[in-house]
UniProtKB/Swiss-Prot annotation:
InterPro entries found in the cross-reference section: Chaperonin_Cpn60_CS, Cpn60/GroEL, Cpn60/GroEL/TCP-1, GroEL-like_apical_dom_sf, GROEL-like_equatorial_sf, TCP-1-like_intermed_sf
Predominant place of localization: mitochondrion
Recorded family membership: Belongs to the chaperonin (HSP60) family.
Organism: Heliothis virescens (Tobacco budworm moth)
Protein name: 63 kDa chaperonin, mitochondrial
Keyword ATP-binding: yes
Signal sequence range: none
């Protein structure tokens, strides 16, 4: 029988609740609203501050930026997104402008893994020129349309200009440029790709010596992470790390706590961490796993299986073979409730983030692994679609090639962290180059796209302004690189524009060269994403007419105390 409540009863209970929570102690602060040119000027100041800090890192003669940290030593870096994230301005309206450019760097980093400084350098002139033209009466919406029209044209030009990366030398060149000219890093990444393939798994870790090293470990990686952040156990970031762990596989969704309790008991009896990989988890079993992790301290983590349908089944079978586990599904009549010690796969190390899982040093039977590899090769010979071939090659790489680990050495934690930033940038840039090809570096590729903008036919004068804004922005990366090398950027750009299509400015040696032949190249994807993200956010920024912020919180005045005593002496 349902119990009905009348409104007086609900009101009284609500009042008691509010009284119990001391709602009067909560204070709701007013908002500050600013409009027009004044607030746009403040936002642009924030953009300038962030861009100034980021610009100095660009190019082979760019310098480092030091970030103070509340805990631990200061961080020294040339990584654009790291510098951008480290900026937090006191003025809230300036900070909004800075935050929007931070968003540009973050998006570029997520999509391409590199090019964050280029994105920041491009965002500033787009926002600045947009604001100036709006103050003269131009329509911000039409300006944005012109900007996006020009960007689409540039992207087409970059695609036509792009050349595929085929050789190990080209891979090394891309990695070297992205690592700020460090040839040792370029060679290290090229060697890693030669060992595990262009699409192989490569990770970066702290080394234990003064030198950088390459280690090849047999392992598997897939794009699914932990189901809940409550499983995180690492103090080096939001990730789960276990050694000598057991792995349990299930193709089906886990609905009941009774399905996971036997596995927990077995893992606990062996005093080993437990990794469960299943299609999905209902609330009850997930709660049991989280509570056992938090309250009892059992080392356990739940992960969703990768893919769907037949691909998920094959991926789990591959993992089970590589780790020596039993795959639970309907065909072999194995249930999670009936799992035994032999049901578990075993790995020497497991690293799990919110987006990926890496199983290292699997202890599977070599004969079973070879059978899986042979089976995949047979399927590869008969595959007809490119999609199926890509999936099969991906599975083959996981089973056959293993994982390349780049161990970065140095004299101190500060030095190692700075070098790791450059290695990660170089690795991401190299992957992007393999994916979409390369274009002349040093800002030359963007300069070669300017003539195509002259052929565009904008619908009105305000759209023409948007196109001209992009023309000016495309010159900025080359200008910045030359300026950081101590030369007049405008003069350098003028000379490069009069040269052949593959020529540009070598800032390291102060000479004009064929950029492709000299190995000064940029991944097409990095340049494309930098321009796309910068123009999208910066042009949206110019369309803002009002900004709303919280007003500064007023501190309560100190209590007034009566004087002690008070009598006459």
């Amino acid at each position: 029988m349902f119990k009905m409540y009348r409104s007086p009863h609900i009101t009284r209970n609500s009042f008691k609740y509010l009284k119990a929570t001391n709602i009067n102690s909560c204070r709701f602060y007013a908002k500050e609203v600013r409009f027009g040119p004044d607030v746009r000027s403040l936002m642009l100041q924030g953009v300038d501050i962030l861009a100034d800090a980021d610009d100095v890192t660009m190019g082979p003669k760019g310098v480092n930026v030091i970030l103070a940290k509340n805990l631990g030593p200061p961080k020294i870096t040339k990584d654009g997104v790291t510098v951008a994230k480290g900026i937090d301005l006191k003025d809230k309206f300036q900070n909004i402008g800075a935050r929007l450019v931070q968003n540009v760097a973050n998006k570029t980093n997520e999509e391409a893994g590199d090019g964050t400084t280029t994105a920041t350098v491009l965002a500033r002139p787009i926002a600045k020129e947009g604001f100036e033209n709006i103050s003269r009466g131009a329509n911000p919406i039409e300006i944005r349309k012109g900007v996006m029209l020009a960007v689409e044209s540039v992207k087409r030009q970059l695609k036509e200009m792009s050349k595929p990366v085929n050789t190990s030398e080209e891979i090394e060149q891309v990695a070297t440029i992205s690592a700020n000219g460090d040839e040792s890093i370029g060679k290290l990444i090229a060697a890693a790709m030669n060992r595990v393939g262009k699409n192989g798994v490569i990770t970066v870790k702290d080394g234990k010596t003064l030198e950088d090293e390459l280690e090849i470990i047999e392992g598997m990686k897939f794009d699914r992470g932990y189901v809940s952040p409550y499983f995180i156990n690492s103090n080096k970031g939001p990730k789960v790390e276990y050694n000598d762990a057991l792995v349990l596989y299930s193709e089906k969704k886990i609905y009941y706590a009774s399905q996971v309790v036997p596995a927990l008991e077995l893992a606990n009896s062996q005093k080993k961490p437990l990794v469960i990989i299943a299609e999905d988890y209902d609330g009850e079993p997930l709660s049991v796993l989280v509570v056992n992790k938090l309250k009892i301290g059992l080392p356990v983590v739940a992960v969703k299986a990768p893919g769907f349908g037949e691909y998920r089944t094959n991926a789990l079978l591959d993992m089970a073979a590589a780790t020596g586990g039993v795959f639970e599904d309907d065909t072999n009549l194995v249930r999670l409730e009936d799992c035994q010690a032999e049901s578990f796969g075993q790995v020497g190390e497991v690293i799990i983030t919110k987006d990926s899982t890496l199983l290292l040093k699997g202890k599977g039977d070599p004969n079973e692994i070879k059978q899986r590899i042979d089976q995949i090769k047979e399927e590869l010979e008969t595959a007809t679609s490119n999609y199926d071939r890509e999936r099969l090659i991906d599975r083959l790489g996981r089973l056959q090639s293993g994982v390349a680990v780049l161990l970065i050495g140095g004299c101190s934690e500060v030095e190692v962290n700075e070098k790791k930033d450059r290695v990660n940038d170089a690795l991401n840039a190299t992957r992007a180059a393999v994916e979409e090809g390369i274009v002349p570096g040093g800002g030359a590729a963007l300069l070669r796209c300017i003539p195509a903008l002259d052929l565009l036919k904008p619908a009105n004068k305000d759209q023409e302004i948007g196109v001209s804004i992009i023309k000016k922005a495309l010159r900025t990366p080359c200008i910045t690189i030359a300026s950081n090398a101590g030369f007049d950027g405008a003069v350098v750009v003028s000379k490069v524009e009069d040269m052949g299509p593959e020529y540009g400015y070598d800032a390291l040696n102060n000479e004009y060269v064929n950029m492709i032949e000299k190995g000064i190249i940029d991944p097409t994807k990095v340049v494309r994403r930098a321009l796309t993200d910068a123009s999208g956010v910066a042009s949206l920024l110019t369309t803002a007419e009002a900004v709303i912020c919280d007003m500064p919180k007023q501190k309560d005045p100190p209590p007034e105390y009566a004087p002690i005593g008070g009598g006459d002496y």
